[in-house]
Amino acid sequence: MSEPHERWRVGPLRDPEFKKVSVLIATAMIDMIGFAIIFPLLPFYAIELNASPFAIGWIMASFSVAQLASAPLWGRVSDRHGRRPAVLAGLAASGIAYLVFGYATSLWVLLLSRLVQGAGGGTTAVLHAYVGDAIRPERRAQALGWISAAPGLGVSVGLLTGSGGFIYGTAVPGMVAAGLCLLNFVFTWKWLPESRIREAGDAARPRRSIRAAFATVVRRPRETVSRLVWIYGAGMLGFSAMTSVFALYLHDRFAITADKIGPFFTYLGLLNFGMRAIVLGPAVRRLGETGAIRLGTITLVVGLVAYPLVPSLMILPLVMLLMPIGTALLFPSTTALMTKYSDPSALGTTMGVAQAFAGTSRVVAPLAATFLFQRLGAGTPFYVAAAIVAMVGLLAFQLPDRPAGPQSDESG
C-alpha cells in the first residue's frame, strides 16, 4: 500500500483518465444542448395547445421534478448494473421523449414527454459516480469541475439552435434534440468503457436501499457524507435563489429592461465556465477539497449578501464574480469528497441522493425567492438564502482535512 503522501501527490490527469473525462464532458454538454433547444420554446408549444399560464408552469417544472425523483433510482441502477448501461438508458429515454415532444398534439402528451425527458436527464449522479470509480482521488474535483462547466456551453449552443430551428416547423427542434441524443448514445456506446469494477462477493453483499440512504442524511446529519449532502443542497439553494430573481433584481435596482438583460447572463455564464474549467484545479491543489469547500461557502455567503448592497451598476460586475467563484469551489469539491467517503458499492446511490437534495433546492428556491421578492423586497431573498447557506455551511468547518476511507455507516 502506498504511503498517504503518495496518495495525495498531485499530477496531471493521466491519458486514459483524460479520455474518459472527455467523453463525460461531451455527454454532459450534448445532453444540455438538447435541453436548451427545447426549454425556451415550451411556452410557445403549450400556447398552441391552448394551455393556461398555470398549465405552462407545471409543464416547465415537470422536468425538474422528474429529474430529482429519478436521480437516486439511476444511481441505484448504476450500482447494480454498471454506470455505462445507466447512462445509455438515460440517453435513449431522452431521445425518445424529445421525438414525442416534437409531434405532441395534446397537453398530456407534452407533459408526458417532459416527464420522460427529466427522468432521462437524471443521470448526472451516474456521471459523478463514474468519476469516483475511474479518476484518481486527487484529481476528481478538477474532473468534476470540467464536467460541470460543460453544460454552460451546451446551454448557449442549444438556445441558438432551438430558436433557429423553430422557424422551419414546430417539430424541428424536437427532432434536432432527438438526433443529438442519438449521436450522444453512439458516442458513449463506442468510447465510454464501464467503470464499475465488481469485486468478489459483491453480488451477495447486502445493498443499501435508497430509503436508508435518505434516512441517514436526515437522521444523522453529523456523519461526514450526510454533512456533504446538506452542504451541497444548501449551496444549490443559495445559487438557485439568486438566479431565479436575478432578472427581477436587475430591473428593480437598475431599471435593466428585457432587451438589455442578455449580456448580464452571458457574463455570469462565462464566469461560471471559467472558474470551473480554469480556476478550480489550481485552487484544489493548493487548498485541498475541504479547504475549497470552506472558502467556497464563505464566498457564496458574501456574494449573496453583497447583491442588495451594490451601490452602482459599475460595481455590479465585480460583485458578480463572487457567486461563480463560490459555486466553482463548493460543488465539485463537495462531490469529490463524497466519492472518497462513500462505500464504492453504493456510490451511485449516494450521488443520486445528493442530486435529489440539489434538485429539491432547485424547485423550492425559485418559489421561495420570488415570493420573498414580491412580499418583502428585492434584498430579502438574498439575505435569507445567505443565512441558510451560512448555517448549513458551518458543517464545512467540521469536516476532516483528509479522508481516511469510506465510513462504516455508509457501507451497510
Predicted segments, located by residue:
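Juxtamembrane intracellular "pre-TM" segments in multi-pass secondary transporters
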Residues: 3-18, 193-230, 412
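A membrane-interface helix-boundary motif in multi-pass transporters
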Residues: 164-179, 371-389
